[in-house]
């Protein structure tokens, strides 16, 4: 989810419910990111899965993912571009790497480089777009192309949408925009209404 909307309170709330809580790291300073990761860990009692989402195109991308890895983050999700450097950071610190992809070919590249999973986004996704295909079109292509978990993203608003993506073969579903209105989101009150 967008810069400073998904911070420690939202990531921790998701992790406490059994999901993977992601902190939107792009746009944060390194000290702010460290503080947010530590706060999320505190809010989960050290349990649950906490990761970051970082935009490859962001100015401090490599510094952000390295800082998060040093803090013992569970996984790094990266979009808005593709980075080979992220895999070296993941290996060095033992952190799972989950790139956001928009094609079967890029998913295969990610798998060869060591991705633990991929998030595949269709045109319905709120950000990091790289395709004109809908998630329902692209998802089966990616699932067939790789042997790692495939997480669908884009257009999932409720349980029916999640169920449909799981029926199409997704191993999981990433939701972002839906959480912008949550109590734990850092979004402005006007956006939450």
Question: Over which residues does each language-model region extend?
Answer:
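Active-site metal-binding loops of divalent metal-dependent hydrolases
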Residues: 1, 155-156
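Active-site entrance/lid segments in N-terminal catalytic domains of soluble metabolic enzymes
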Residues: 1-149
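Conserved active-site-proximal phosphate/metal-binding subdomains
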Residues: 10, 125, 132-151, 157-193
């Amino acid at each position: 989810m967008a810069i400073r909307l998904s911070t420690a309170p939202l990531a921790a709330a998701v992790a406490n419910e059994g999901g993977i809580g992601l902190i939107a790291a792009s746009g944060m300073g390194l000290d702010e990111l460290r503080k947010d990761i530590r706060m999320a860990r505190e809010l989960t009692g050290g349990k649950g899965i906490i990761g970051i989402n970082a935009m490859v195109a962001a100015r401090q991308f490599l510094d952000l993912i390295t800082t998060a890895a040093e803090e013992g983050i569970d996984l790094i999700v990266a979009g808005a571009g593709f980075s080979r450097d992220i895999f070296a950071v993941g290996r060095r610190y033992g952190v799972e790497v989950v790139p956001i992809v928009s094609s079967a070919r890029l998913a295969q590249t990610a798998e060869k480089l060591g991705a633990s999973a991929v998030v595949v986004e269709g045109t319905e996704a709120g950000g990091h777009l790289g395709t004109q295909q809908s998630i329902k079109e692209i998802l089966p292509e990616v699932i067939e192309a790789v042997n790692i978990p495939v997480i669908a993203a884009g257009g999932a608003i409720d349980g029916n949408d999640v169920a449909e993506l799981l029926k199409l073969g997704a191993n999981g579903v990433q939701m972002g925009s839906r959480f912008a209105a949550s109590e734990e989101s850092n979004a402005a009150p006007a956006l939450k209404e």
